C-alpha cells in the first residue's frame, strides 16, 4: 500500500518548485502591446507612426524631420482560472465532498510604461524604445493550485490504512516577472519609397516566486490533527507492529524453526512504510519556497518598409534573445529531482525570448481612412527553455491582425482592430503552473491632436480566451480546464518638435 510514498514525496517537491513558471508572460507569450496605438488598433506592423519604433522601425524614417517623443501608460488586469477534477479532492475539509475545484489567480499590472523616441534628420532616423516586452506584473493564487492540493490529497488517501479519512490545508502561490527592454537603432531612407532599419535590444529580466503549503491537517476518528502529530502517531504504531514481528521472529529462531516468509514480508513492508513516513517528516510544518531570478540578454533587430501608391508594406525580424536566469533561492543543495535543481541557488536556467517575424500591409482607402493587416510568427521551438519544454509544443505561435483608422477631423482619429492568437499546444506542455490558451482580442481608441506639437491618446484592449481541456486519466477522472481573462486600459502623449 505504501510503496508509492516516495513518489508522493517527489511530487510534493516537484509541484511546489515548478510554480516558478506561473506568472511568466514572456516564454511563448511575448508582450506586443507596447503603445497606446497598439491598444486602439493592434495591426500596426505597416503603420507609419512613432509607435513604429517598436512595431515598424523602418517606417519611422518617413515621419517629418525633428524630435518625436511618445510616453505611454497602461493598466492590465488578468485572471487565470483552472477547473480541476480529482477524486482525492473529495477528502478535503473545505471541498464538501466534491471532486471538482476551481483555482483562480489574479494578476494586476498597475503600471506598464513605455517610451518611444526618434530624431529624424535628412534620410536618417535615430531611435530609442523602452518597454516591457515580457512579464509586466504579478499573479497570486490565494488558495494555491490543484497540483498543490492533489499532492496533499494523495498523501491522505495513501494514509487511509493508518486511520486517515481526510485532509485540510492552506495553499498559496505568487509570481512576479518583468522583462525590461531597451532598444537602440537607426533607420535609413534609401528613397522616397524604401527604408531599412537595424538595431539592438537589451532585455533585463527579474523575477520573484513564492510557493507555500501550510496548516496541513489529517482527519482521523478522533477529529483533525496536524500532519506532524499524525506522522508521529503513525510511526509509534508502526514501531509497535515491527516490535511484535521481531518478537515472533525471535521465537522461531530460538526454536530452530524456519521463519515464515509471510512474517519477513510483513516486517519489510512495515519498515518500508516507516522509511516513507520519515521522508514526509520534513513537510510536517508545510513547505515554503522563495526564489529570485535575474538575467540580461541582447539580440539584433532588422526591418524594412516599402511604399507604393496608396499601399505600404513592412517587415521586421527580431532575433532570439538568449536569457540565462540566475537563481537566488532557498534551495541550496543539489537533488536527484530535476524540478528542485531548476531553482537551486546560483543555478543558471535557460529562459530564451523566442525570435519573431512580423509582416504587415497598410492601404489608404481614402485620404482619411486606412486599413491595416498584420501577421506575427514566434519561433518558440527554436528557443531554449529549462528541461527543453519547447519540444513539448507542436509548433510556434501565430497571430493574425486587422484594423482600421478614420480621421474624423484634422485633430481627431478613431480606430479599432482585432488580433487572433493561435498556439500549437499539447497536453504534455500544459499544466496549472504555466499555461496559455488560444484567444481573440479587440481594441479601440482615439488620438486627439491638441496642438501642432502635442497629441493625446487613449485605448482599451480586451482578450477573450478559449478553454483548453486536458484529461490525464479517465478512470478515475483526473482532468483540468484552463482559461483566462485580460483587460488593458491605456493613455499616452506624443510630442513633436
PLM features per residue range, with description:
Residues 2-25:
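Gram-negative bacterial Sec-dependent N-terminal signal peptides
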Residues 4-8, 89, 184, 495:
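Intrinsic disorder/low-complexity segments enriched in polar/small residues
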Residues 20-132, 136-138, 435, 461:
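N-terminal, post-signal peptide beta-strand-biased segments of exported outer-membrane/organellar beta-barrel
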Residues 18-19, 68, 195, 469:
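Hydrophobic alpha-helical membrane context
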Residues 15-22, 92-94, 189, 305, ...:
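Short stretches within intrinsically disordered, low-complexity N-terminal or propeptide regions
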Residues 26-39, 43, 47-48, 112, ...:
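Outer-membrane beta-barrel porins/channels
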